[in-house]
Design a protein with these regions (language model features):
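Alpha/beta-hydrolase-fold serine-hydrolase catalytic core, especially in secreted/extracellular enzymes
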Residues: 60-128
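The feature captures the conserved acid-bearing segment of alpha/beta-hydrolase catalytic domains
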Residues: 1-63
């Protein structure tokens, strides 16, 4: 299960408190803001997952960096809805991480799919 900067607030507590039994990877911005409960719910969900789980928070990114918006228009930068990491490399690098995660858990291809991303982008990674 892969989640790109998804919102956990509307997810019912039964799911948050049970977690899931399949591998899980969350990749997203460093913060949703000081009043958001999103990461509190994500952390509880992560703790309750019953398989490998990752939380990758990338500093200087925003929600729309995890979409195709940077390819479509430079308007995101002007409106300040894209972070500083938005550039022509971020989406391809993000795609490599996504592909690496799925290759590991669907094809048993055990290459280190986080290492290059971690070297290039200021990020925090939580794994269990």
């Amino acid at each position: 299960c892969l989640n790109l900067d998804g919102w956990f607030v509307p997810i019912v507590d039964d799911i948050i408190n049970t977690g899931i039994k399949i591998p899980f990877c969350y990749i997203g911005q460093e913060s949703w803001g000081p009043k958001s409960k999103n990461y509190s719910k994500l952390n509880t969900f992560f703790d309750n997952c019953q398989n490998d789980a990752y939380i990758i928070k990338v500093k200087q990114t925003k929600h729309f960096d995890y979409s195709d918006l940077p390819y479509i228009s430079s308007l995101g930068k002007k409106l300040k809805i894209n972070g500083k990491a938005s550039n022509k490399d971020f989406i391809p690098d993000l795609n490599k991480v996504i592909l690496g995660f799925f290759n590991e858990y669907l094809k048993n291809d055990l290459k280190d799919w986080i290492e290059d991303f971690e070297k290039k982008y200021d990020s925090t990674i939580k794994f269990k």
